């Protein structure tokens, strides 16, 4: 909370002034820090202090604001004079400050949305939470959701959010040992629910079904009923809001296959390849690991009657496998499996850890398909979001191995040396290739005393003299600048 010092002549401000209000700044504990006069202008909130410069908060920099009985609070952004923070002021006219600020926001064409805050009753003192999202339209008496349906009347205090959304890290929560007396920060025991804003024409056409529930807690529908309800639903009651999410596009495809082939609706730990095929005429869905690409004879096996699946079979299969792949085991587990795989490198068995293109042993992907996904996102609250893989075949490790085997080093190449015989230089030497040892360095010659006869002798002094003579030649083209280095022409 911001700390503000004493006020500017509080007695001179009448109690019913339209734009000036007597306020007292409080901290997280509700302790009064100082008093002042809060003034609402056409563009900013001004706090007048005694013998100090006034503090200003432009309306465009306010993230959210609200009131509760005799407490007015707001959250400022990073561009304000005070920086980012939450400020609370006690005032008997807190509701008037809120309403006036709401009107000024709308007059300045600032997008203001009201957020419903639903608080469950508990034994602790009533506290309210600052909402973390702003996706509801403006309202004064009845909160409303983004899809146009009216919500339940707000039992708690009212909060409005400015266009900028703060991050969750910007909200200040009291320490575990604190018991805040001012109703601004909420505890972890309180539940708050919000409705996501749908975007796009498809979401607008498929609006949520809104079904009011009687008072009291209503348990979630069973998982079997959730699978039959294809559209997301929102259940409202005065105390809280219940959500039932619809299946994902990948889940819809699985449900379509299950509706076509009843044998697909097996227990969660049932293998697709082990069950009897009771409906051979219907298309069958097969799941496999496709992290390295689809192999021949695997993937989606559909009948020719499914014309819509012919062009997008690989793409939809990849989407299904991407969402339903189990998490990989830790890398350190591959060290134990690697020791077992090194023993079988000489044979043709596939129990080793020679990785394929996708990091798993070759020839085993079709034998251990993944578990069928049977849970939707509605049941993900109590279950894992990834299916559990089936029991792996004995002797066939499925651990991802990053130690890709590389071919051994190539044998060193042999270098052939030949000696050139110069005329008049010593005796004749035999011609022909000589193959030294494999070490790469030439071996010792049989005649070390005559090894210098095979090379030409360069006269370094003569070479330097010829170079100096060439540089000293005169240049009469007129383009060379005369310096002390080339001004003297040496005779040829």
Curated annotation (Swiss-Prot):
One GO term under biological process is: fibroblast growth factor receptor signaling pathway
Give the top-rank taxon of the lineage listed in the UniProt record for this protein: Eukaryota
Instruction: Kindly give the SUPFAM superfamilies that the UniProt entry links to this protein.
Output: PH domain-like
| UniProtKB keywords | Lipoprotein, Membrane, Myristate, Phosphoprotein
Q: How does it sit in the membrane?
A: Lipid-anchor
Please provide, in alphabetical order, the Gene Ontology terms of the cellular component aspect for this entry: cytoplasm; plasma membrane
Q: Where is the IRS-type PTB domain?
A: 13-115
Stretches of the chain forming a coiled coil according to its record: none
Q: Can the keyword Lipoprotein be found in this entry's annotation? A: yes
Extract the InterPro entries matched here: Docking_Protein_DOK, FRS2_PTB, IRS_PTB, PH-like_dom_sf
PTM: Phosphorylated on tyrosine residues upon stimulation by BFGF or NGFB.
Q: Where is the composition biased (Polar residues)?
A: 133-147, 166-185
- Kindly give the SMART domains that the UniProt entry links to this protein: IRS, PTBI
One GO molecular function term?
Answer: identical protein binding
Location in the cell reads: Membrane
Q: Where is this region: Disordered?
A: 125-205, 337-413, 425-492
Q: For the lipid attachment N-myristoyl glycine, which residues are annotated? A: 2
Q: Does the keyword Lipoprotein apply?
A: yes
Give me the stretches of Low complexity compositional bias. 374-385
Q: What does this protein do?
A: Adapter protein that links FGF and NGF receptors to downstream signaling pathways. Involved in the activation of MAP kinases. Down-regulates ERK2 signaling by interfering with the phosphorylation and nuclear translocation of ERK2.
Q: How does it assemble?
A: Binds NTRK1, FGFR1, NGFR, GRB2, PTPN11 and ERK2.
The molecule here is called Fibroblast growth factor receptor substrate 3
Q: Which organism is it from?
A: Rattus norvegicus (Rat)
**Upper taxonomic lineage:** Eukaryota, Metazoa, Chordata, Craniata, Vertebrata
């Amino acid at each position: 909370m911001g700390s503000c010092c004493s006020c500017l002549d509080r007695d001179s401000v009448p109690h019913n002034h339209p734009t000036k209000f007597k306020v007292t700044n409080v901290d997280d504990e509700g302790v009064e820090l100082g008093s002042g006069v809060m003034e609402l202008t056409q563009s900013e909130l001004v706090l007048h202090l005694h013998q100090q410069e006034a503090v200003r908060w432009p309306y465009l920099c306010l993230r959210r604001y609200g009131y509760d009985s005799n407490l007015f609070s707001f959250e400022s952004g990073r561009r304000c004079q005070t920086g980012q923070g939450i400020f609370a002021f006690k005032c008997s006219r807190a509701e008037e400050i809120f309403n006036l600020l709401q009107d000024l926001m709308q007059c300045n064409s600032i997008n203001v949305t009201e957020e419903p805050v639903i608080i469950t009753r508990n034994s602790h003192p009533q506290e309210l939470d600052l909402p973390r999202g702003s996706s509801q339209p403006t309202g004064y008496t009845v909160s409303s959701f983004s899809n146009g349906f009216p919500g339940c009347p707000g039992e708690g205090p009212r909060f409005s959010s400015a266009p900028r959304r703060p991050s969750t890290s910007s909200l200040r929560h009291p320490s575990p040992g604190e018991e805040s007396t001012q109703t601004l920060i909420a505890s972890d025991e309180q539940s708050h629910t919000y409705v996501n804003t749908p975007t796009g024409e498809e979401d607008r056409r498929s609006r949520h079904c809104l079904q009011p529930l009687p008072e009291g807690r209503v348990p979630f529908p069973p998982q079997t009923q959730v699978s039959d309800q294809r559209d997301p639903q929102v259940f409202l009651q005065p105390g809280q809001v219940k959500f039932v999410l619809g299946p994902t596009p990948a889940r819809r495809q699985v449900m379509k296959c299950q509706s076509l082939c009843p044998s697909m609706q097996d227990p969660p730990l049932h293998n697709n390849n082990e069950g009897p095929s009771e409906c051979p005429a219907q298309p069958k869905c097969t799941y496999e690991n496709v992290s390295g690409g689809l192999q021949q004879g695997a993937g989606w096996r559909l009948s020719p009657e499914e014309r819509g699946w012919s062009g997008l079979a690989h793409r939809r299969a990849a989407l299904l496998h991407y969402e339903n792949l189990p998490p990989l085991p830790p890398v350190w587990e591959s060290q134990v499996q690697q020791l077992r795989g090194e023993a079988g490198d000489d044979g043709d068995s596939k129990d080793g850890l020679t990785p394929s293109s996708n990091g798993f042993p070759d020839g085993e992907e079709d034998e251990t398909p993944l578990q069928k996904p049977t849970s939707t996102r509605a049941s993900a609250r109590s279950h894992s979001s990834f299916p559990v893989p089936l029991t792996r075949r004995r002797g066939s490790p499925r651990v991802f191995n990053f130690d890709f085997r590389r071919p051994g080093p190539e044998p060193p190449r042999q270098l052939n040396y030949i000696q050139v015989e110069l005329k008049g230089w010593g005796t004749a030497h035999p011609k022909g290739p000589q193959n030294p040892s494999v070490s790469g360095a030439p071996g010792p010659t049989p005649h070390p005393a005559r090894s210098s006869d095979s090379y030409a002798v360069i006269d370094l002094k003569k070479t330097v003299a010829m170079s100096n003579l060439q540089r000293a030649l005169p240049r009469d083209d007129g383009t060379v600048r005369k310096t002390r280095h080339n001004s003297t022409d040496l005779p040829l």
